[in-house]
Amino acid sequence: CILVDASGLERDVDDIKTEMWEKYDIDSLETGRDFEEPLKWSYAVGLLIDRLEDEKLEGETVVHLHEWLSGPAMFNFDSPAVFTTHATVLGRALSNSDFDLRNAVEHGNVDGSLAEDYGVKAKHQMEQTAAEISDAFTTVSKNTGKEAEAVLNVKPDKILPNGFNVDEYPSLE
């Protein structure tokens, strides 16, 4: 187990945000701690993975990252990356309002610009970028896959169910 203390990156947050803007058009200028804390931590994890690649792992690594919070790690290492989302950031925000997400996903038309209206623009852009630049993009269900395709405009490469169908297994009672 490795614990990552990213507090040393506090003074570098603006530089990291600039890098994200210049390389990926992620607009995080007006974000707060709910974006910046995961940004620092994930960025630090990416630096750690890069160092481990150089010193210990020798090309034997595939990094599996979950949710937008882990996206910045991908900026710092060369190993193949799998990015998984369990639900999109914008989908979660829309689901907590009167927006008919199910219908919009069914018709494949969720306007990404809604992320700004719902206060999740930078998180949405980070998630979309992570899905785009990963070597494999996965979701945890067919429904989440449809949501990701409609919201992020990125079709998942694979569905990796995060559970199993209990009806297919005999009861242990």
Indicate where each model-derived feature is located.
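Catalytic cores of nucleotide-sugar-dependent glycosyltransferases that transfer UDP/GDP/TDP-activated
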Residues: 1-173
